[in-house]
Amino acid sequence: PGYVGIPFPDTEVRIANPDNLDETQPDGTEGEVLARGPQIFKGYLNNEEATEAAFHGEWFRTGDMGVMEEDGFIRLVSRIKEIIITGGFNVYPGEVEEILREHPSIDDVAVVGRPREDGSEDVVACLDLADGTALDPEGLKEYCRERLTRYKVPRTFYHFEELAKDQMGKIRRREVQADLIRRLEAEKD
């Protein structure tokens, strides 16, 4: 997540209502990032089904949720596939991670969904703590409550010695989530 700048010349980008991609969101409102222009690819070779899923009319569906700021800059919020649905609300992991990374006891963080029996998820934070720092779940909850809407506050905080990352050092949320689920299963036994 973060700012990606303004669209390239001859490229149009718009933020669409996720529930109705024909509707453009007002500036400052989150939505699905769509793009079109001469440099956008035309589709997947020999895969019409994937091409249809990747486009809404002539607009390419980037797979990102973002905001068009009033100055025309685009801020990415999260990947659509990483959205956590809790209590009927959408939580974008990147937004919660951004807040937690500002906390002095946290070196790095991955916010993921912990599956519940009813099919929804709990928002949880997997933390790589700064050296010499102890996990303080209540302190972290209070810190988050002061900065986030109630439903975005992680229910639980887990300490990890190391969070799964790719070669570029970017957190791999799906791997962290899988590591968490394995850990929780092992704790049940």
Report the location of each language-model feature.
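Conserved AMP-binding/adenylate-forming
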Residues: 1-74, 81-83, 96-97, 132
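General small-molecule cofactor/ligand-binding pocket signal
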Residues: 157-160
